[in-house]
Amino acid sequence: MGVNAVHWFRKGLRLHDNPALRECIQGADTVRCVYILDPWFAGSSNVGINRWRFLLQCLEDLDANLRKLNSRLFVIRGQPADVFPRLFKEWNIAKLSIEYDSEPFGKERDAAIKKLASEAGVEVIVRISHTLYDLDKIIELNGGQPPLTYKRFQTLISRMEPLEMPVETITPEVMKKCTTPVSDDHDEKYGVPSLEELGFDTDGLPSAVWPGGETEALTRLERHLERKAWVANFERPRMNANSLLASPTGLSPYLRFGCLSCRLFYFKLTDLYKKVKKNSSPPLSLYGQLLWREFFYTAATNNPRFDKMEGNPICVQIPWDKNPEALAKWAEGRTGFPWIDAIMTQLRQEGWIHHLARHAVACFLTRGDLWISWEEGMKVFEELLLDADWSVNAGSWMWLSCSSFFQQFFHCYCPVGFGRRTDPNGDYIRRYLPVLRGFPAKYIYDPWNAPESIQKAAKCIIGVNYPKPMVNHAEASRLNIERMKQIYQQLSRYRGLGLLATVPSNPNGNGNGGLMGYSPGESISGCGSTGGAQLGAGDGHSVVQSCALGDSHTGTSGVQQQGYCQASSILHYAHGDNQQSHLLQAGRTALGTGISAGKRPNPEEETQSVGPKVQRQSTN
C-alpha cells in the first residue's frame, strides 16, 4: 500500500515557501490539500463580507495553482476535530502536515488534532513559515518572557541564527510521482463555495479593491520592489493624500492570509538593498513592517487573554466608558468629524485604511475623544479589515489606547488638523463622503464652522444632511489626557516602575512620542491650533513600556475607580535593553487625586454628550 498524505491549509495559502507541504509530499504516493471552513477562522466568527470574499478568492487561486500540478484543493465544512477522524479513515492517511500557528487558540486547536492523529496512527509534520523566527526561541532567549519593548526585541533577534532561506516553490518536478485522487464530482463535494452559498447578500457589492490570492500577492511584491523612488533611497515615504488610498503595491492582507511568504519578502528586500547599496548590510529598519508583526506575534503567543483587558497581564485596567450609541456613530462613520467618518467609510467599503488613518480613528475612540475601550474598536477592525490579524490587531489597539506597549498619552491626534495637513484640498473627504463634496477646502474638515450661505451652496446643512460633531475635541482630549495622566501617576507611586518618565507639566506641549504601528509611520505633522495635543513626528521605534494593574472596583460615588487587587502582579519593563520585572505586594488602593468635577463636553450637539458626568473621586 502507498503512503497517503494530507496537507491542511489555514493561513499559508500559497505554494511558494511552504516547507510543511513540501515535506508532506516527499515520500508520499498521494497528497490531498484541504481547507476546512470552520468557526476558528481568524479566531472569531466576527468576519465581514470583504474579508470572506478575500479568503474565497485566495482559495480559488490556490485551487487554480494546484490544478497546474494535476491536483485540487478540497474545501470541507465543519469542525476540524469532527472532520479529521473521518478523513483519516476514509482516505487511509499516514501523515498530516500543517504550518505552525503561534496564536493561543491555534495552538489549542492543533494540539487536539495532533492527539486525534496520534490515536489514528498518523504522523504529524509541523513547520514554521508564517513568522520569520521561532517565537519560542525568542522568548527562551529572554528568560522565558516575551520582550515587551521593540528595542529589546531587536536586540534578541540580532543574537539569533540567520534566517533560513525560503524553500523551493511546489512544482510538477517537486510533486514527481505524488498524485492527488480527484473524483468526477469534486466540485460538488469539495469546491470553493460562493459568498451566496455562505449566506451573504451580494446585491450592490462593488468589485474588490484588493483581489485575493498568491498570484496577485507575487505580482504586487514585484511592483512593491520596483517602486523607483522607494528603491532609490530606502526611506519611508512622506505621508500625503495619495497615501490614504489603496495602493497596487500594498501587501498587508497577503501577509495576513499567508498568500505571500514573509521570508520571501524579507530576502527580496535584502537582495534589492544589497544590489542598490553595493553589498552593504541592510539596517533593521528596512524590515519594519515585518518586524513589528513579529514583535506582536511574540508578545501574544503565550497569552490567550491578549485581546482582552481583564485578565491580561500586560494590559492596564482602565475604567473606560460604556456608550453603545457613541460606539455605533464611530463604527458607522457618523461622528460629525469628516476626517474620522471618511476613514471609517473607506474601511467599511474597501476593507483597508492607511496605518496612520488607523491611528487617528483608534485614538478618537479611546483616549482621544470618546474614552471607549480599545476592545470595542478591535472588534470592529476584526470584522472589517482584510489584514486584521489577532495578535497585531490587539497589540496595536492596546498600544494606541495607552493600555500597553506604553506610548506618551499626552500626544493626541486631532480629528481636524491631522487630516487637513495630510490632504489640504480634502479630496479624500469628497471621495468617501460625497455629501460634503460641495464644501470648499477651507471648511471641509470642520464644516460646522462654515457660514450658512456656504452650507446652502454646498447643499449640505450641518445637523440636517450631515451630523454635527459629537464631541468638542479640544475639551474631550484635554479631559481624557488628564484622566490617563492620573491613572499613570497612580501607577508611578509604586517606585521602580518609572511609568511616567516624561510626563510634561504642559500636556499640550511638543514631544517625540513614537507612533504605534504595524508599519513604522511616515513623517507627519500633528494637531496645532485646532485643539488637542501636538503629535511629534516619530518612527514607531520608541521604547515600549508595559504594566499590569489589579481589579477595578466601584467607589461610593458610583464612578468606577481603579484599584489594585491583593498581591497584584505589576510588571515593569525598563528603558533600553535591560528588562526587569517586579512583583509588588500591594493592598487595595483607589485612584488618588480625583478628576475635577464637571460634565463631558456637549458642543452644538443634537444628542447627549458622550459618557456620564465625571464626578470627583475621593481618596481612599
Swiss-Prot record:
Protein name per the record: Cryptochrome-1
Short sequence motif named LIR 5, residue ranges: 271-276
Family of the protein in this entry: Belongs to the DNA photolyase class-1 family.
Domain Photolyase/cryptochrome alpha/beta span(s) in chain numbering: 3-132
Chief place where the protein resides: cytoplasm
Position of sequence motif LIR 12: 486-491
GO cellular component, one term: cytosol
One annotated GO biological process: response to light stimulus
Organism: Sylvia borin
